[in-house]
Amino acid sequence: FDEWNTWLGKIEVEGGSREQQIKFYTDLWHALLGRRVVSDVDGCYLDQTSDFPRICRIPLSASGKPLYNHHNFDAWWGSHWSLDILWSMAYPHLMDDFCNTMLDMYRNGGLIPRGPSGGNYTYVMIGDPAVSFFATAYNKGIRNYDADLAYEGLRKNAFPGGIRDHAGYEHSKDAHSGGMEYYIKMGYVPDGRANVVGMHTTGASMTLEYAYQDWCLAQMAKAMGKQADYELFFERSKNYKNLWNKASGFMQPKGTDGEWLPDFD
């Protein structure tokens, strides 16, 4: 009870009815569910990003305590609409833990994840939602992690071979169904790509995700003084325009031949 009061008490509300206040704190409680500390008191945690499960350990302080907690949860996908903002305002220490968790996975498995689950990569949904998470944290001064290493991993994800190249639920190590080669070469991810696997493979959705994530990476690059990368990713963030069909009034998928795809709804 006291523990939940501490977490929920980070935000105090005034006014409104009692029912509205109950609803607010119930929703805040929901926003804090689903994330689990999986590291032990000695800093050990299970990592499954390699071919075999192994025990890894968080660095310890001079007093022998872990410098942060290692967490597991579902994918980050969609968190930029609300949770990133909430956590950065009310629970910055939690964002630091999450950022360090993702960097643990980058060190262990070679990719910053969409979301660590069971000590492994989930490949749920599409894109690289971790970049908006890191950009939020970094630009709000939440930086108790290796920011240079984070940027290195996020930049890797923004090119072929990174996490974006995994379509939704595409688990193979040599994933390509995310269409990053098309995105870089053509300025959008087309539908009708050959040899595509996975559950979420639609090119228009990928293009819009990648463009937004490029914008986020551009903001982080700018804040870190990486001007060339800022210009690169800011320019790439305009790729969403390549799928705007003025005639239909919608974002509309294209094929590999550059033609609009009909009956796309």
Task: Please report, for each region that a protein language model flagged, where it lies by residue.
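Acidic/polar, glycine-enriched structural segments that form the non-catalytic walls/loops
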Residues: 1-70, 144, 148-160
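Structural helix-adjacent loops and short alpha-helical linkers that scaffold large soluble proteins
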Residues: 16-20, 36-46, 89-99, 138-152, ...
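Active-site-adjacent structural elements in folded domains
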Residues: 11-15, 42-72, 114-121, 167-206, ...
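Alpha-helical support elements that line or immediately flank enzyme active sites
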Residues: 24-41, 71-95, 135-141, 215-224
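Secondary-structure capping and boundary motifs in well-ordered enzyme cores
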Residues: 19-20, 69-78, 122-130, 205-210, ...
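Long, well-ordered core segments of solenoidal/helical folds
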Residues: 35, 91-113, 149-165, 179-195, ...
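Catalytic cores of carbohydrate-active enzymes
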Residues: 113, 218, 222-265
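A conserved hydrophobic secondary-structure block that centers on an alpha-helix together
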Residues: 14-17, 63, 69-85, 89-115, ...
